[in-house]
Amino acid sequence: MDLYNNKNSDTSKIKRDASVNDRIPDGLFLACPYCGAQMYNKQLGKYRVCAKCNYGFRLQAWERVELLTKNFEEMDSDIQMDHPEFPGYAEKLKRAQSQTELAESVLTGTADIEGEQVALGIMDSYFMMGSLGSMTGEKITRLFEYATAHTLPVVLFTASGGARMQEGIDSLMQMAKVSAAVAAHQEAKLLYLVVLTDPTTGGVTASFAMQGDVTLAEPHALVGFAGARVIESTIHEKLPKDFQRVETLLENGFVDQIVPRSELAQLIAKIVRLHTAEAE
């Protein structure tokens, strides 16, 4: 206390080291979007889950591949389209491609998951919010067509904000296009396994996200069609807290099982093996 009480003390000799950065780096601490718990970034671990509620933080497609398999062969990586003349659309696409190392909002290919060969699709919410564009629909359609031709099960991780508004009706048509490919795959008595991740909304929810033979989900993932605020403004009522969370969907029969991210690969392989044995 003498330092503060002594008016004659010389504090001018205390100098700040200019080489030291006293600013807290961005992203060092995070708040869980579901429970609000504050945590150190490294506490999330390799699976990127909240230690308190097990909510799975959003992953990029390539990050999820690393968690699922060591053997992945990408398909249609060079797919392109003539972009509609929507102001700024081409620039947004280029920026998203640079940030995610993807050509479109879905990564597709074949993979070995715990010894089981599957056709794998992973939507990426970091690519324009995982929006469903015409090339997204084309890639998913081709994935199902390939799987049908090669008698492979399809495993699709959904994550989307809905149809891509910049493409108008072309985007909306992808719902029907992918659904037709799903139907042909199921007609061949092949397995289609969906994993709902946060967020899965809009046209994706209204079509192929809800057409799987088995529907799994990550804890506390947001799944719905319209946003909660849109619904509330329409019906003029306050919605329940977990109205569009997968826990509510599970209670009402829309989801078969909620699975921690660390257990997904093993469970997917087990389901594929059971289906293969049944088919034989």
From Swiss-Prot:
Signal peptide (UniProt feature, chain positions): none
Zinc finger map (C4-type): 32-53
Entry's localization field: Cytoplasm
Name this protein carries in UniProt: Acetyl-coenzyme A carboxylase carboxyl transferase subunit beta
Pfam family, one: Carboxyl_trans
BP term (GO), one: malonyl-CoA biosynthetic process
PANTHER family xrefs: ACETYL-COENZYME A CARBOXYLASE CARBOXYL TRANSFERASE SUBUNIT BETA, CHLOROPLASTIC
EC number annotated for this UniProt entry: 2.1.3.15
Alphabetized InterPro entries for the sequence: AcCoA_carboxyl_beta, Acetyl_CoA_COase_Trfase_b_su, ClpP/crotonase-like_dom_sf, COA_CT_N
Reaction catalysed by this enzyme: N(6)-carboxybiotinyl-L-lysyl-[protein] + acetyl-CoA = N(6)-biotinyl-L-lysyl-[protein] + malonyl-CoA
Originating species: Leuconostoc mesenteroides subsp. mesenteroides (strain ATCC 8293 / DSM 20343 / BCRC 11652 / CCM 1803 / JCM 6124 / NCDO 523 / NBRC 100496 / NCIMB 8023 / NCTC 12954 / NRRL B-1118 / 37Y)
Quaternary assembly: Acetyl-CoA carboxylase is a heterohexamer composed of biotin carboxyl carrier protein (AccB), biotin carboxylase (AccC) and two subunits each of ACCase subunit alpha (AccA) and ACCase subunit beta (AccD).
Cofactor note: Binds 1 zinc ion per subunit.
The family this protein is said to belong to: Belongs to the AccD/PCCB family.
Gene name of this polypeptide: accD
Main localization category: cytoplasm
GO cellular component terms attached to this protein's record: acetyl-CoA carboxylase complex
Domain spans labelled CoA carboxyltransferase N-terminal: 28-280
Top-level taxonomic group: Bacteria
Enzymatic class: transferase
Described function: Component of the acetyl coenzyme A carboxylase (ACC) complex. Biotin carboxylase (BC) catalyzes the carboxylation of biotin on its carrier protein (BCCP) and then the CO(2) group is transferred by the transcarboxylase to acetyl-CoA to form malonyl-CoA.
Coiled-coil segments on the chain, per record: none
Alphabetical keyword list: ATP-binding, Cytoplasm, Fatty acid biosynthesis, Fatty acid metabolism, Lipid biosynthesis, Lipid metabolism, Metal-binding, Nucleotide-binding, Transferase, Zinc, Zinc-finger
Pathway it works in: Lipid metabolism; malonyl-CoA biosynthesis; malonyl-CoA from acetyl-CoA: step 1/1
